[in-house]
UniProtKB/Swiss-Prot annotation:
Listed pathway(s): Purine metabolism; IMP biosynthesis via de novo pathway; 5-amino-1-(5-phospho-D-ribosyl)imidazole from N(2)-formyl-N(1)-(5-phospho-D-ribosyl)glycinamide: step 2/2
Compartments reported by the entry: Cytoplasm
GO molecular function, one term: phosphoribosylformylglycinamidine cyclo-ligase activity
Name of protein: Phosphoribosylformylglycinamidine cyclo-ligase
Keywords: ATP-binding, Cytoplasm, Ligase, Nucleotide-binding, Purine biosynthesis
EC number from the UniProt entry: 6.3.3.1
GO cellular component, one term: cytosol
Lineage: Bacteria, Pseudomonadati, Pseudomonadota, Gammaproteobacteria, Pseudomonadales
Organism: Azotobacter vinelandii (strain DJ / ATCC BAA-1303)
Chief location category: cytoplasm
Length: 351
């Protein structure tokens, strides 16, 4: 009877040395994102972070998210550099709408076979996103799981914790009829609607890698990283105290996300003609023959964030946002009403 040869973890498909090599490569990324409140570096069992000084009744705000099937498109195109920015954006933008300052971020990277170069590019993007948001990358998990994922395919999840003064939590409770709605532009589809986008690409037979739109590579338009709104919005909150509610426009578009911050007895009235929809959305609508209302229910259509302020604070809010580098515009207002349609879209284009 032949003796069973000695097996190693590597024989089973898990390369511990590759994992350790990745950790060494990303330590510098984590150091660049450090905040003074963070205690220690990567490698411990848990990450420690103090509450920043100056808070009287600090409330921690947490969030977790992924990037959906945009990840599949990233893998197909070999574009791994900015998907980490998307991951951070999806988490920190959800925190800032509560008025919270993001403190720290952790990531989860799962794959069938670890490609250290790809993973390092992804984590470098995560670090870039953390720098843009002002939060520290304090740790994460890299899981090599042969048999769970196909080859070097990978999945991502992000986790973020922020802090807000209890008396300054923004929850929409003060929103009232007559208030104004200000929009901030998106960079493209951000990280939502990509199952529809991929189906449109498939059925239209589009060569994503080779196609262009208005002289720009279609791949770049579709893979543009999700914008991170943290710093301009925190500036708006702190300098004006005027923000009553904010809605991060993700999956569900304007029609599903704005109602999440509206109190009973109010509805949002949006003027779709108040902005020029980026060409990539019109291209997707045409190629997929997508109904106009479906477009606004699935995609952000050029609007990444909506901010509610009192009507007499509009000019001040617009000025602060412009000074922070944003290009805001007045997109609509709040009206009284308890109907089933919490968001009314006016001036929808004919399709």
């Amino acid at each position: 009877m032949s003796k069973q040869p000695s097996l190693s973890y590597k024989d089973a498909g898990v390369d511990i040395d590759a994992g350790e090599a990745l950790v060494e490569r990303i330590k510098g990324v984590a150091r660049r994102t450090a905040r003074p409140e963070v205690m220690g570096g990567l490698g411990g069992f848990g990450a420690l972070c103090e509450i920043p000084a100056g808070y009287r009744q600090p409330v921690l705000v947490s969030g977790t998210d992924g990037v959906g099937t945009k990840l599949r498109l990233a893998m197909n195109l070999g574009k791994h550099d900015s998907i980490g920015i998307d991951l951070v954006a999806m988490c920190v933008n959800d925190l800032v709408v509560c008025g919270a300052e993001p403190l720290f971020f952790l990531d989860y990277y799962a794959t069938g076979k670890l490609n250290v170069d790809v993973a390092a590019r992804v984590v470098a993007g995560i670090g870039e996103g953390c720098e843009m948001a002002g939060c520290a990358l304090v740790g994460g998990e890299t899981a090599e799981m042969p048999g769970m994922y196909e080859g070097e395919d990978y999945d991502l999840a992000g986790f973020c914790v922020g802090v807000v003064e209890k008396s300054e939590i923004i929850d929409g409770a003060k929103v009232a009829a007559g208030d104004a709605l200000i929009a901030l532009p998106s960079s493209g589809p951000h990280s939502n609607g990509y199952s529809l986008i991929r189906k449109i690409l498939e059925l239209s037979g589009t060569d994503v890698a080779g196609a262009t739109l208005d002289g720009k590579p279609l791949a770049d338009l579709l893979m543009a990283p999700t914008r991170i709104y943290v710093k301009p919005l925190l500036k708006l909150i702190r300098e004006t105290g005027a923000v009553k509610a904010m809605a991060h426009i993700t999956g569900g578009g304007l029609t599903e996300n704005i109602p999440r911050v509206l109190p009973q007895g109010t509805r949002a009235v949006i003027d779709v003609a108040s902005w020029t929809r980026p060409a990539v959305f019109d291209w997707l609508q045409e190629k997929g023959n997508v109904d106009e209302r479906e477009m606004h229910r699935v995609l952000n259509c050029g609007v990444g964030m909506v901010v509610c302020v009192a009507r007499d604070k509009v000019e001040q809010a617009l000025a602060v946002l412009r000074a922070a580098g944003e290009q805001p515009w007045l997109i609509g207002d709040i009206a009284a009403g308890d109907g089933a349609e919490r968001v009314q879209l006016h001036n929808l284009k004919a399709h």
